[in-house]
């Protein structure tokens, strides 16, 4: 017998499932899309144990004809296309005929479906893709699909899945995306028997956005629309005061299909230009309509990516759509708007969404100040040592820390360009970045306090309210105990806010809101161990509380920074990996001046 043999249909389906079905959220996506293609106006989604134990999708769509029940579970069997011409003009969500067969091949699946004017419906069961049961049941209109023990026959796949909480979030994100695509459909989501959300059908997209993300979004959305050259676009973008420090608030749909645009995020940043800080990313909910023959949706197994016939033309259209509204939404020029946005006083700070951040968390510069505006900031005449840690004593900082032999400062000579400390070390000359050096000091100080749980809790005179979406609030409350491990105590306030009443003593009053927002953003959707939480919090505190470029430092403070830096475990890098100092040995200097 030859070595090359044809694979069994079951194995072929399992291999195909590996491309289409990443985890439970992929099953939810495929089944919701089938429901949409069937004309459903109501949909219930249920999951248990992150969808691995159970997934159930129920819709009121047109149902499946009795003679099509069995073929529906076969690979490459579909009612949506017949020839290549149909594929070129496809508008349905699904068209390959892979989803049900792939899902059935890696689960125990039960499919029930009925059509109009029929007294009976049909039920079919399969185990690992093999039909085990088929029977008539009382009639109804629509489809119910039950998926149990996902990946029961592919245990390796189960090993690579994340925690139940992580899988639950992915399912919520999938339903959220589909609910944005179809505001006219009622969605209900239940996880482990608990109602996550009920979204009534809406007459417009904005109401659906508010349903999902919170009432605080309503006043920060700018409506966009443009029609040109066979392209039509509608939707909403956030005003420049309302943004996230990651891209998870950006949703793009083409012909109703949620997709990832190759340069979408880059185009958005370009459209907003300098209206946002470097780490700011706007929200967007954009809906494009285009002749299906001008777009290829068949380039990705999960249909996440698409290809445009005229990509350059689409990118130009995308950019114009955003810039047109940004220009018309304000009476001031872009330059004036930039200066207004990038130079607020502390009193103008406002946080309208959980992940809105009002400073460049990694830029090393003062909040919302661009490089060219730095010289206009009033210079501090001195710097408070308390921001660097408790007292002048180094005992708390140096406990159990071996002094790093590669950086032993002798004396400093001053500061160059209001940023770089010039100092003589034991074996040469050093240039130290005052911001990154203080970041390293603060990072190790806070990390040590967290690891030893050696910090107190101080009440706030005025509690801080943080506006969030309903889902964000639930995510925070689900992680309440984790956050309390780093001294963050957040309680619900209504349906779309949380309140902070006390802070850990390693934070300085006045900086706590931005630190906590940054911390929540960095932990969003991530599984984190206790040491990882400590590391993230220490980085957030260090980044926000460290002295900045341009801060005027007295001689005693300069000496204290150098002394404390020398006791750090890793004095040569800030927590984000940037260098804190550059050193030239005496030999280096003598070679530069040809003395050697």
UniProtKB/Swiss-Prot annotation:
GO biological process: mismatch repair
InterPro entries: DNA_mismatch_repair_CS, DNA_mismatch_repair_MutL, DNA_mismatch_S5_2-like, HATPase_C_sf, MutL/Mlh/PMS, MutL/Mlh/Pms-like, MutL_C, MutL_C_dimsub
Keyword DNA repair: yes
Any one annotated GO CC term: mismatch repair complex
The keyword DNA repair is annotated on this UniProt entry: yes
An annotated Gene Ontology molecular function: ATP-dependent DNA damage sensor activity
Disulfide bonds, paired cysteine numbers: none
Assigned keywords, A-Z: DNA damage, DNA repair
Record Pfam families: DNA_mis_repair (PF01119), HATPase_c_3 (PF13589), MutL_C (PF08676)
Source superkingdom: Bacteria
Family as reported in the entry's similarity comment: Belongs to the DNA mismatch repair MutL/HexB family.
Function: This protein is involved in the repair of mismatches in DNA. It is required for dam-dependent methyl-directed DNA mismatch repair. May act as a 'molecular matchmaker', a protein that promotes the formation of a stable complex between two or more DNA-binding proteins in an ATP-dependent manner without itself being part of a final effector complex.
Protein name: DNA mismatch repair protein MutL
Organism: Leptospira borgpetersenii serovar Hardjo-bovis (strain JB197)
Top-level taxonomy: Bacteria, Pseudomonadati, Spirochaetota, Spirochaetia, Leptospirales
Name of encoding gene: mutL
